Each structure stands twice: as structure tokens, then as C-alpha cells.
């Protein structure tokens, strides 16, 4: 298994505020734009479960930035050639094959 975790120490609000200032709007508006655009951007990859999971986690995180976690925990060992085959032939199956989850504020 593998896990990538980001713990916010205030940088998210500062980054959103900075991005908003650069675009003559607020950090809150930038957060709303990100929340709206994320599902649209992810839809092109044809991974609806991952799209919904990422969108829900991002919405939760942007509403109250604490932490964001990406975990890959396959139910059983996955041989590397199987991962490569899925990546080349059916990339939309990778999140399920690898047991990918994306969560926020847990």
C-alpha cells in the first residue's frame, strides 16, 4: 500500500487569496471555481468513481482545509506487468485495481 497525505498549515487559504488577488477576485471565489471545474476536468478521463471521490474530497478540503489523503491499497497483491497492462490498455481501471481512495479532513 501507499499513502500521500498533505496537512494544511494555512497555506491553502493564502494560496487561494493570492490567486484571487491576481485575478481581481477573492480566495473564496477561486475555491468555488475549483470546486466547479474539478469534476469537469476529471470527466475527460472516464473514471466516474475517482471523479466523484476526488470532487467530494476537494469540496470538503476547500470548505475547511485540514488534510488531503490519497491512498492506494489494493485488496490483493498486484503484479507490476498487470499494472502496466491496465495503464496501457484500460487506464480507467487503475483506480479500482490499485484500491485508490481520496479523502479529506480525516
What are the language-model segments listed below?
Residues 1-106:
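Glycine-rich, small/hydroxylated-residue low-complexity segments
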Amino acid at each position: 500500500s501507499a499513502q500521500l497525505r498533505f496537512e494544511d498549515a494555512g497555506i491553502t487559504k493564502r494560496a487561494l487569496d493570492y490567486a484571487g488577488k491576481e485575478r481581481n477576485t477573492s480566495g473564496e471565489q477561486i475555491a468555488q471555481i475549483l470546486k466547479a471545474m474539478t469534476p469537469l476536468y476529471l470527466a475527460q478521463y472516464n473514471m466516474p468513481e475517482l471523479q466523484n471521490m476526488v470532487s467530494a474530497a476537494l469540496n470538503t478540503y476547500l470548505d475547511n482545509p485540514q488534510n488531503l489523503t490519497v491512498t492506494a491499497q489494493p485488496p490483493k497483491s498486484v503484479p507490476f506487468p498487470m499494472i502496466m497492462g491496465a495503464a496501457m490498455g484500460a487506464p480507467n481501471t487503475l483506480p479500482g485495481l490499485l484500491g485508490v481512495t481520496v479523502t479529506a479532513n480525516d
